[in-house]
Design a protein with these regions (language model features):
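Short hydrophobic/Thr-rich beta-strand motif most characteristic of the beta2 strand and flanking loop
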Residues: 38-46, 54
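Conserved phosphotransfer microenvironments
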Residues: 27, 48-52, 61-81
Length: 204
């Protein structure tokens, strides 16, 4: 049934997944579950640091990390792997020790699946990990944009005699009309003002 569903699937995959697990049988189970859920396995490899190179080339949407109980060095690789990749990670393990959970949290892992694999849980777990990751990125971007938005509001308030609320509404409306992020519109406002100030007053 899995082969039939994979063969006749149309459109893009639900996600492109990297599986890092040194256990071949475990990788096979994960691959089957990913494909059954409408996903595509872009990378399969043991959980090693050199897998980062391959994953960067393929650009998965999400990576499943499966450290083995005998691989004492593998949990230590998780922070390095998650730091290098611009995608969420999900931990697949039978180890429920609190120290492992804390280590995974510090590494930025966005989801957990316990062995043995329950295939029905894989889809919702990957979807939730992606949603959490995107929200985190949105908040990080908003934090980075805030100084530029504040400066642009101040410039609009000064140049156009607007209140702070009016200046913010103007920026937001421009962002919606141009389908740009608010921070990008703010940067454009500041860049335009910088260009204007560089022009001699008599030439304006």
């Amino acid at each position: 049934m899995r082969a039939i569903r994979t063969m006749f699937r149309t459109g893009p995959p639900r996600w492109r997944v990297a599986i890092l697990d040194r256990d071949c049988s475990s990788r096979a189970l994960l691959r089957a579950a990913v494909e059954d859920a409408g996903g595509l396995v872009a990378v399969e490899a043991p959980l090693r640091l050199d897998a980062i190179v391959v994953m960067k080339e393929t650009g998965p949407d999400v990576v499943i990390l499966a450290p083995s109980l005998g691989g004492s060095h593998e949990p230590a690789l998780m922070p390095r792997i998650t730091a290098e990749l611009d995608c969420p990670a999900v931990l697949f393990t039978r180890d429920t020790d609190r120290s492992v959970v804390k280590q995974a949290n510090r590494a930025g892992v966005m989801g957990f699946m316990l062995k043995p694999l329950r295939a029905a849980e894989l889809g919702p777990t990957l979807d939730l990990a992606l949603a959490r990751f995107r929200e985190l990125r949105r908040l990080q971007q908003a934090r980075a944009d805030r100084p530029f938005v504040d400066q642009a509001k101040g410039r609009l308030m000064s140049d156009r005699q607007l209140s702070e609320a009016e200046a913010f509404r103007w920026l937001r409306r421009q962002a919606m009309d141009s389908r740009q992020r608010l921070g990008d519109v703010a940067r454009e406002v500041l860049a335009a003002e910088s260009v204007l100030q560089s022009v001699p007053e008599g030439a304006r």
